[in-house]
Amino acid sequence: MKRITLWCMVLTGVLLAPAAGFAQISCSREGLQRAVDLYIAAQTKGDTSGLPLAMGVGYMENVAPADINKGLIKTPMKIDHVRSLLDTATCQTYTEVIVTDKEHPYVFGTRLRVNHDKIAEVEIIWTTTGYWGFGADAYLNYSSEEKWDTIAANKRDTRDTLVAAANAYLDAFLEQKKDLVPWGYPCNRTEGGAMHTGRGNADDSCDVGVPSGVNISNRRFIVDPAIGAVVAFCTFGAGNVNGGSGAPDAHLFRVESGKLRFVHTVTHLLQANFQGGQRGQRGGPAAPGRGAPPNQQ
C-alpha cells in the first residue's frame, strides 16, 4: 500500500511539473518577470514552444495584427540589452530590446499582456537598418550607461503622476505648450539610437527640437512606479499630411521626483519616407514599412 501511494505521489509530481512552471506567470511582479524571462528565452531562440501562450493569443507588429508563426518573435537573435517595465495594475509588461548583430541589428519594444497564467497578447514595435534614426550600437551605448534603478517606496511617483508626465511631453508636440512639461535636469533623450541629446552636463535638457502640429495619438500606457517608468505605445501623428505620418511609435520615460530624466523612442518608419525638415515631422500621409522583418521578406 505504501509503495502504491508513493508511486502515485511521484506520478502526480511528474504530471504537474510543467503546469507548475507555467503557473509562475501571474500579475504579481514576480509572475510578470517570469513572463518576461520566458519571452526573452523564446526570442533568443526564435522558438515560442516554451511560452505559455493563451489559446487564440493576439500577436501584433507595428500596430497591425500579424501571424505569430511568421513574425519577428520567430527570428533567433543574440540580445545585447533588455530593460523591462512590470505593470501589475494592468497585467502587462514592456521590454526594450537591443540587438547589435552586424547583419541583422534591431531595436524594438515588446508588450506582453498576461491573463492568469497565460500570455494573452504579444505586441512588438521594431526598427532596423534603413529605419528612421536607427543606430543599435549607439542605442546600446547610451541605454547601458543610464541608471533606471528601483526607487525607494517612499520616494516613488504615483501611477497618475507618471502618465501625466508622459502625456504632457507628448501633448507638447501638438501645441508647443512646453511650459507644461515637467522637464528635469539633466535629461537625456535617445531616438532610434542615431539621435541623442546630452553631453554629460548637469544642464542637459530634453527640451530641444520639439516640433508643433504633430498629434501623437492612439496612446496606450504601461506603467511601473517601482522604477519610475512609463511607456506610451502610440502613433506619431494621426496619419494625415499636416499632423504627422501615423508611424507606429513607442516613447519610454524615466521620471524621478516628478521630473523627466530619460526619454527613449522607437519609431517604425523607413528613413526613405521621412519627409520632415525638423525633428518630429516623421513621414508623409501614410505609415510605411509595416511588413515582415527585413530578413524574412
PLM segments and residue spans:
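Bacterial N-terminal signal peptides that target proteins for export
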Residues: M1-M9
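Bacterial N-terminal signal peptides
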Residues: C8-P18
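C-terminal and inter-domain tail/linker signature
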Residues: F22-Q297
